[in-house]
Design a protein with these regions (language model features):
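Receiver (REC) domain active-site loop signature in two-component systems and cognate sites
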Residues: 62
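Non-catalytic signal-transmission and effector/linker regions of two-component phosphorelay proteins
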Residues: 1-8, 114-129
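Acidic catalytic/metal-coordinating carboxylates
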Residues: 40-43, 66-69
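Conserved phosphotransfer cores of two-component systems
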Residues: 49-51, 73-80, 101
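Active-site beta3 strand of CheY-like receiver
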Residues: 51-57
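Alpha4 helix (beta4-alpha4-beta5 surface) of REC/receiver domains from two-component response regulators
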Residues: 69, 90-107, 111, 115-118, ...
Length: 129
């Protein structure tokens, strides 16, 4: 499968190590470009409004504003932009809450990184259809 245009991704995570790893993961893929990074939910919202990404990858547990609160605001401001919650938490309650908010996919940090790319592509293809 190939996409006709590169899709922009915003990475939001308070861990500089995770942000860097995710940026490198997406940059290795020919059909993605990382348009920006943010270290908390509030900064993520600001950058999303300025950069208008095709996809946003959010951590759950962050200072200033967590991933759930940021997702609520982002879904109001940019309802068509898919959100992926990339989190260490795997609880059913967190998954249920994420679905209620409108988070499109949940990927555990314990999963192989290819799962994140696979789900990102799936969301962007379904959004384009």
């Amino acid at each position: 499968m190939t996409l006709t245009a590169r899709k922009s991704v915003l990475i939001v995570d308070d861990s500089a190590f995770i942000r860097h790893a995710l940026c490198e993961l997406f940059r290795q893929e020919a059909d993605f470009e990382v348009c920006g990074e943010a270290e908390n939910g509030k900064e993520g919202i600001d950058k999303a409004q300025a950069l208008r990404p095709d996809l946003i990858v959010l951590d759950l547990s962050m200072p200033v504003m967590n991933g759930f609160d940021a997702a609520r605001v982002l879904k109001r401001l940019m309802p068509a932009v898919p959100l992926i919650l990339y989190s260490a938490f795997g609880e059913k309650l967190a998954e249920y809450q994420a679905r209620l908010i409108g988070i499109s996919e949940i990927v555990s940090k314990s999963e192989h990184p290819s799962a994140l790319i696979h789900k990102a592509r799936g969301l962007l293809y379904s959004a384009a259809a």
